[in-house]
Amino acid sequence: MTTVHGSTIDIPTQDGVADAYLTHPDDGVPHPAVLFYMDAFGLRPHLTKMADRVAAAGYTVLVPNVMYRHGRAPVVELPEFINPAERPEIFQNLRPAMQSLTPEAAMRDAGSYLAWLSASPLTTDGPVGTTGYCMGAGLALRTAGTYPDRVAAIAGFHGAYLASEAPDSPHLLADRITAEVYFGHADQDSAMPPEQIDRLEDALTAAGVVHRTEVYDGAHHGFTQADTAAYDAGAADRHWKALLDLLGRAL
């Protein structure tokens, strides 16, 4: 297995400084870049392990703490394993940070993350890939639509409210996307019901975006997150194959 090197770094943004986890093969040569968007629980050991796995496949991976305006990660105290009974209190504590991350603020930040990756000697020239989980899937989709000249691949897993009726819903950026797209939805996910899955699919198809959308039978919201009760090993394995296949094709 490829040895990777991970570290915590700081990235200047228009609104401050974002802490982030950076990981890459420990071989001294540049690699294609991947912008990895966290779920709502944020930067924590499980996510850094996931990022390391992507890096081991031959990528330089950046995982920003997108809630940096409310403090360095972890923004709120998290248990080693997040039990269902603890989720309401955790989300209550996270709500101010989540609500302050408006689409406009998130995309200003995305420009800073992409600029940092472009300037880094650890990355190759050319476009990046982006992947996101839970709310991060929406951030990945917005990034691909806001910076189409910089993003060649976008993946999202158990994404939330990607095609709502809100006037700033992420799916409304579909006609700006030039990247190849993959979404893996959970069929037991109230945050991404069938009507939103269909609306997202219709938007991508109408825009002529090269894409693939799959619904993972029996999976719940958060199925990739091994430190939660929603984890589904089979669905997580399926996600890894889909993600790494996409990055391998597009980058």
Model-derived regions, located:
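N-terminal cap/leader regions of alpha/beta-hydrolase-fold enzymes
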Residues: 1-251
